[in-house]
Structure formats: structure tokens, C-alpha cells
Amino acid sequence: MMKRVIKLGGSFLTCPDLESRLQRWQETAPPAHCLAIVGGGGLINSIREIDAVVPLEEQTTHWRCVELLSHTFEIMKQRLDWPTIERVVELEHWIQNPPPLGKITLVRVDTFYRSSGSPVCESSIWNSHGSELLPENWKTTTDSIAALLAWGIHASELVILKSCSIPPEASLAQLAESGIVDQAFPHIAKELQNVRIEQLAVDG
């Protein structure tokens, strides 16, 4: 049973033809049971801009940005006709009883990724080791958070969909150095079976 995690870049929040682009991508992707998360886009960038002028406490800022991802989740939920997961128990049910192949389910990030002080139900598949894989600062973005989800569900592959072009021969370390993926990504990606980083093609 192939399981795939997809990360949609936050820049797609303002992409007018996102739905048709995703449909074309799905038509060419190998069949799999799919979970997806969405990045923070301009919401997170605004916090970066504030931090550049008035330095903020790293860990607090990290979790503040994670909280903002609930808003980008709601926006994408409104745009896309995808089922959603918003509670730990729903995620665990998906793992045990995934929907039909090809169906993409949108996951709210704080379903599986929370600060150490936040309560998570005892039946959760997530443990402290998962959180330790990611630094709680700007080195971690939704690229690495998607990788954490892929690691947690033992996904067959992780697909990072970007709006920018991807150098075909670049290593993960080189992609991190150029800012295409975050700095934590090369480390956590070592925990995964397969990783693909792709540009979501423009229609036409």
C-alpha cells in the first residue's frame, strides 16, 4: 500500500489556476494514498520581516508560525474539494483505513505537530523523537514538517511541490543552501524512503 505525503508551497495560496495544475499533476502521479499540508506563504513571510527588524524569541516565534498554518489550512480547505483531517484520531483512522487510491486528504499541521507543552491524545502515533528531529526556529519550515508527517506514517514517498524551478542535479544540501528547501530538510529527509522535489507545472 503506497502512502504519499505532499507539501504544497504557501505561494500557491494566491495561484489562480491551482486547481487545474493539481489535477494535471495527479493525472501523471503514480497511484497512492495521499496526505497533504500547505505552507504559510505571505503570512509567515510577514513574521520573518518583523523578526528581521525586531528580533523575536526563536522558539516562541516558531510555534506562533505553526499556529498561523491553521489559517492557510482553512483557506486551502475552502479552495480545494479535498477531505480534511483536523484531529489526531482522524489521522490515526486514515492510517488504519486510508481512502481510495488517488484521493488527497488535507491535514491541519497542528494535528500532528505541536509544542512539547501541548496535550496530544495518548493513542497518538507521534512521540518525542519526532519533535526532536526538527529545530524550533527558522531552520524548520513546512518542508521539514511535511517530512515529519511522512516519517510518522511511514510514507513511501514525500513530494514537495514548489512554484519555482528546481535544478535537476542539485543535492538536498544544495537546495537548502539556495533556499529552495529549509535548512533542516536534508537531515530529516535521511529518515524517509523517497523524496521528490518538483515544480508544479503551469497550465498551457
Feature-to-residue mapping (PLM):
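N-terminal glycine-/serine-/threonine-rich phosphate-binding loop
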Residues: 1-36
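Short, active-site-adjacent cap segments at secondary-structure transitions
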Residues: 12-14, 42-45, 113-114, 166-168, ...
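Glycine/small-residue-rich interface belts in oligomeric ring/scaffold proteins
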Residues: 32-48
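Short internal beta-strands
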Residues: 35-39, 160, 198-200
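Ligand-binding beta-strand-loop-alpha-helix segment within the catalytic cores
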Residues: 48-145, 149-152, 176
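Polyanion-binding loop/helix "lid" in catalytic or ligand-binding cores
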Residues: 137-138, 142-147, 172-204
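Glycine-rich phosphate/pyrophosphate-binding loops
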Residues: 153-170
